[in-house]
From Swiss-Prot:
UniProt-listed GO biological process terms: photosynthesis
Gene3D superfamilies found in the cross-reference section: Phycocyanins (1.10.490.20)
Protein task: Allophycocyanin is a photosynthetic bile pigment-protein complex with maximum absorption at approximately 650 nanometers.
The protein, known as: Allophycocyanin alpha-B chain
SUPFAM superfamilies linked: Globin-like (SSF46458)
Any GO CC annotation of this UniProt entry: phycobilisome
Family under the similarity heading: Belongs to the phycobiliprotein family.
Organism: Cyanophora paradoxa
Membrane topology: Peripheral membrane protein
Xref: InterPro entries: Globin-like_sf (IPR009050), Phycobilisome_asu/bsu (IPR012128), Phycobilisome_asu/bsu_sf (IPR038719)
Keywords carried by this UniProt record: Antenna complex, Bile pigment, Chromophore, Cyanelle, Electron transport, Membrane, Methylation, Photosynthesis, Phycobilisome, Plastid, Thylakoid, Transport
Length: 162
């Protein structure tokens, strides 16, 4: 749920207009819209590079994943891992666009640990993979934009590690 929607729902629940403070919050949020869109465009344009760098980082930390018997051994399994990278990267951009972590939680976090456990995917490997994805993404962003993006990756990492 976006910040604007949340403020409107709160005001409606209390049968009132949004307060001046809430309107200022909305105004500040809307002022950051172009910046958030620019960050998302940068990530989208660099998706392939980000995913390639992140996968190389993960395979260096966990070479056993791409060895015979590993979860990412073989072209099919490896392509599934890379598909997940793209999915998590998009999920982060949803949070950036909304300015909130709720889309990440609703779309992608609920039940993720159970899913990976049922598939035999080591959760620590997923934590490491999202960390690699975060590092790779931050490498294509400015320091200021990186600060905007970090909390969304950290949210996913913390949810998986819990």
């Amino acid at each position: 749920m976006s910040l604007v929607t949340q403020i409107l729902l709160n005001a409606d629940d209390e049968l009132r207009y949004p307060t001046s403070g809430e309107l200022e919050t909305i105004k500040s949020f809307l002022k950051t819209g172009n910046k958030r869109i620019s960050i998302i465009n940068n990530i989208a344009q660099n998706e392939k590079k980000i995913i390639e760098q992140a996968s190389k980082q993960l395979w260096q930390v966990h070479p056993e994943y791409i060895s015979p018997g590993g979860n990412a051994y073989g072209a099919r399994q490896r392509s599934l891992c890379l598909r997940d990278y793209g999915w998590y990267l998009r999920l982060v951009t949803y949070g950036i666009l909304a300015g909130d972590q709720r889309p990440i939680e609703k779309i992608g976090i609920i039940g993720v640990r159970e899913m990976y456990n049922s598939l035999g995917v080591p959760v620590i490997g997923m934590v490491d993979s999202i960390t690699a994805l975060k590092n790779s993404t931050l490498s294509v962003l400015s320091p200021e934009d990186s600060e905007e993006v970090k909390p969304y990756f950290d949210y996913i990492i913390q949810a998986m590690a819990a």
